[in-house]
Amino acid sequence: MGQKRQRDSKSSTFHAKKRKKAENATAPDSDDGWDGIVGADELNWKEVALPDHLEDAGGFFGLEEIEGVDIVRGSGNGEVKFKAVAGKPKKSILKKKAPEDENSEYDEEWSGFSDDDADRPENASSPAVEKPEKSDTKADKKSEKNADKKEAKDAKKKEAKAAKKEQKEKGSAIQHDTSINAGLSFAALQDTEEDDGADVSAWDSLGLSPEILTGLSKMKFASPTSVQEACIPQILEGHDVIGKASTGSGKTLAFGIPILEHYLEKKRDDISAEKEKKSEKDSTPIALILSPTRELAHQLSKHIGELIAQAPGVNARIALLTGGLSVQKQQRLLSGADIVIGTPGRVWEILSTGQGLIRKMQQIKFLVVDEADRLLSEGHFKEVEEILNALDRVEDGEVPGGENQASEEESDPSSERQTLVFSATFHRDLQQKLAGKGKWTGGDVMDKKESMDYLLQKLNFREEKPKFIDMNPISQMADNLKEGIVECGAMEKDLFLYTLLLYHPKHRTLVFTNSISAVRRLTKLLQTLQLPALALHSSMAQKARLRSVERFSSPSSDPSTILVATDVAARGLDIKGINLVIHYHAPRTADTYVHRSGRTARAGASGKSVIICGPDEMVGVVRLAAKVHANMANGKKLPLESLELDRRVVSRVKPRVSLASRITDANIAKEKISAEDNWLRNAAEDLGVEYDSEEFDESNGKGRGRGRGRHQKQKEVGSVSKAELAGLRAELKQLLSQRVNVGVSERYLTAGRVDIDALLRGEGNASFLGPVDPLHF
């Protein structure tokens, strides 16, 4: 065996020193034999961050916590001590002590020459200075090295900034030269002419900044609408504004432009004061815009974002807070946002669970309540009240002597806040249900005093009397809107809906219903009839809702696209090209009818609104006409014109609708039975019992409870076999492949009144074979 090699004495002393250093680093300064057990006072406690809505949490504000420690109980006196968990550095749980400066005698501030220094001999000065120890010189060298590194880094940063500045100046000079040279060629002149926007001289009277005017020019907004012309100057002067205007009149930019003007003014003030750029955490938003629906919130963000993108020098950031999307992402967006747009539920969820967010929101300069009559209606949107209370909350100062001063400082931001309220309807009487046997109150639809009192009770305006701007005191319906009513039997609504759609080919149509189940059934019915139908309701996932709106509003989509929706699409949805609005169910309230019909005839365009009215809805429709058109002059024109559909057309399309209804009802019943069966099977598995579907159906059929007849009918409809469904589909396909014949001989085309040349050219309504008079109203 070989002899074991002896360890070098130098390396052994080196390792011993290393171990000694490590022990000294982990142990406290006072104790050399420290076992890692310390008292509560020696721990590095951290303050607990509480959500804003807890306020002081009933006196528990100021709680502290620590992580990574184990509790050690004393054997005799019961004193509780702590030690670091395994794997955690022991020094990390201790309080950080202020470092004692060993070289303090060298770091004293120089106070100038004294007389003693002048009297002292030269050779006596050198021995007076004692040489520091070796360790001290090492520490000095280390600190000097760190200082040198820091200085070098700072110098590099300054050089990089200077280089960037020079590069920018050179780039701008080059760009200027190229633009001058490009101006000499005619091609460049043609390009500039094509890129020129609209003439915005009509906006000059509003006193807008050049940046905003440039954005409006690029967006082709040549002149302001009436509501914009009336509201923007009042908002820029600092007044609280209540704006009432018909749907599609440009209310979004009426409050969006003043918000961006304030952003630019604030930006100029910061530049003139040469303020340092704040971090995202320190920035506070300037505006909060509340919307009743997610679709309207997305639309507001889109419209204001387009103006921001087109206006040079406007870099305002928008945070969109709506349900159905990631909360974490929205919290990150909110941290650096200038404008916050959202629905009340998600806005309050984020504000109430965050730290310091409510205090930030209390400093906003604009609070905008869009579609205020819906947001502030009784029994809806409880979160709106929570948000308003949080914005107006004033906390008392902790110091008794400084309570007044603290309250004044905290109340200043809310006193500077402008409140802007916009809607097409404000009258509370419009929210009364039209159907039912309760007491019905008619009368003046637009009472300014009642509208003002109603809003003053709900909102904390800065001014005692905010500016009330009413752009349509007589009628809230658009001027170019034509309203009609189609009377039908209770079971014939599907038939008359399909007939109305055939009368209006290549029309983008919006169909409103009062229930989600009706949306689902009608969408499948129209798709079975080979019509491009889309669904939109509140039970859909947010991405599916956005997808439906995008497909419906896309310019490249089929011009005959139909959107079947609940009242979630009734407010604020601005989709270009909607020609027809059909109310499959009569609206429950008058304000709902106003907003539903407002999806068409927007921004000066024409449109039609038609109610399909059954016998049981006639009373509600009569009340609706009395409420909405109460102030019509002398009753010269009927508010809702009765439409008579050609009975030949109705009778010819009836077989199509009957087949499509049978197919749709069978598919829906099968899906419902399958879903119920799966639910019962899973419940039986969870309970550990056997499930027999036939036995369950027999016991369910013997009962006499509520819904027995509906279940029986559903079972009968769902019992249609696949072969029968295939036969029904084939028969329907055969009918849909032919045009609707309205009394024309297919053998002898020239014998009737058919214009063969027009048929060959594809003119007229392609759904019908023969002349059909269009619906004029």
From Swiss-Prot:
UniProt name for this protein: ATP-dependent RNA helicase mak5
Classification lineage: Eukaryota, Fungi, Dikarya, Ascomycota, Pezizomycotina
Bias kind Basic residues: ranges: 703-713
Entry function: ATP-binding RNA helicase involved in the biogenesis of 60S ribosomal subunits and is required for the normal formation of 25S and 5.8S rRNAs.
Gene from which this protein is expressed: mak5
Organism: Neosartorya fischeri (strain ATCC 1020 / DSM 3700 / CBS 544.65 / FGSC A1164 / JCM 1740 / NRRL 181 / WB 181)
Cellular compartments annotated: Nucleus, Nucleolus
Segments of skewed composition (Basic and acidic residues): 1-10, 130-171
Residue ranges constituting the Helicase ATP-binding domain according to the UniProt record: 232-444
Domain Helicase C-terminal: 496-646
Residues binding ATP: 245-252
Motif (DEAD box): 370-373
GO CC terms, sorted: nucleolus
